[in-house]
Amino acid sequence: EKTKLIVKEMLDLLALDLVEKGLVTNQIVLTIGYDKDNEYHGEMMIDRYNRKIPKHARGTINLERYTSSSKLIIKEVIKKFDEIVNRNLMVKRINISASNVLYEDKVKDMIYHRQLNLFTNHQNINQKDEKEALEKEKNLQKATLKIKQKYGKNAILKGMNLEEGATTRERNEIIGGHKA
């Protein structure tokens, strides 16, 4: 659960980075690296130090549309995380990257098609409400960025950043991988 919390924090920061730079993505790649475990008898690989370690878990998440919404990104990536992670192994490394990144203004005019389902009441799906919710979230992300730029990265935190095992506060104080 601590690993899942850290993944959520990293995704939230990734979404904020996308908003800050005016970018959107439709694909996230999640890689989980495990610590060496002598008790593990599954698939192994050799690391750069020539040690046998459990093979890392990797998942590619294709989003329905280009987005920088942390809610949409977190929801989809956590689903994939639950599928690929081996809960019996200790996680040593988490890599998250956004692929297929475009500038936001290039995708504004894109038309998204949704596959219809015979069992869904399509009259209840209101795309206007969904679009307003995404716009509201983007405005909140922009306001968060302004506060962080003015008062520091730890000036505004989410509740998950205060939970036990959360690492955002410590990561915000690190510069280039070293404590400031």
Predicted regions and their residues:
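Basic, low-complexity intrinsically disordered segments
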Residues: 1-180
